């Protein structure tokens, strides 16, 4: 490989990348101005499309992007539409970090709603901190105690596989949760635990 061929290869990759982003931008434009209002009854919002294109520009330019927008502009769809299409077209992962679990769960619902509209089937993972999940060993110890024996229904739900605090209905009282949740997982601390994988 010659020295000059490195630059040609980089130029070819840049052209291919630009072509992918252009193709995604065409889909984004068609979605927000044609499909969303006509096929799905969603309101066309100029600020939403502007934000979607700004996100594509950030992806194309490989830079960080922060946006502040008022309530009702459609921020979730504005970043999910281009990023879901980007993931479909490139196969590359997309990470969206939020400040609250409630917003993460809203985004999960929005992705379920958008996926058939965009003809995408992304692999989506909702990541929360470990304290939001049951520690089987601590739960077993608690349910064996006199205090824990009064929570037979809760124990049964855990045995059936419910592990996420927000999935329990009715909600688990804080004083009970702090006795059954994962406090701090580490290989060393959990060494020998029959539930650790």
Describe each region flagged by the PLM:
Residues 42-59:
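N-terminal pre-P-loop "Q-motif" helix
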Residues 61-65, 88-95:
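Short, surface-exposed connector motifs at secondary-structure boundaries
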Residues 54-57, 76-90, 110-114:
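Walker A/P-loop NTP-binding motif
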Residues 2-39, 90-197:
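A substrate-engagement module of RecA-like helicase motors
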Residues 61-81:
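Walker A/P-loop
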């Amino acid at each position: 490989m010659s020295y000059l061929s490195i630059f040609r290869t980089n130029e070819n990759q840049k052209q291919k990348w630009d072509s992918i982003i252009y193709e995604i931008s065409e889909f984004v434009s068609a979605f927000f101005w044609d499909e969303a209002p006509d096929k799905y009854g969603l309101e066309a919002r100029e600020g939403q499309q502007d934000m979607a294109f700004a996100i594509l520009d950030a992806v194309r330019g490989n830079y960080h992007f922060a946006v502040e927008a008022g309530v009702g502009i459609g921020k979730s769809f504005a970043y999910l539409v281009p990023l879901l299409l980007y993931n479909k077209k490139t196969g590359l992962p997309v990470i969206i970090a939020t400040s609250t679990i409630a917003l993460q769960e809203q985004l999960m619902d929005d992705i379920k709603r958008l996926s058939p509209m965009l003809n995408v089937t992304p692999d989506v993972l909702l990541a929360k901190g470990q304290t939001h999940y049951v520690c089987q060993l601590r739960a077993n110890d608690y349910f064996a105690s006199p205090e824990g024996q009064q929570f037979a229904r809760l124990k049964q739900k855990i045995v059936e596989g419910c592990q996420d605090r927000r999935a329990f209905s009715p909600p688990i009282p804080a004083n009970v949760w702090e006795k059954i949740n994962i406090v701090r997982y580490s290989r060393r601390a959990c060494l020998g635990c029959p539930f650790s994988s």
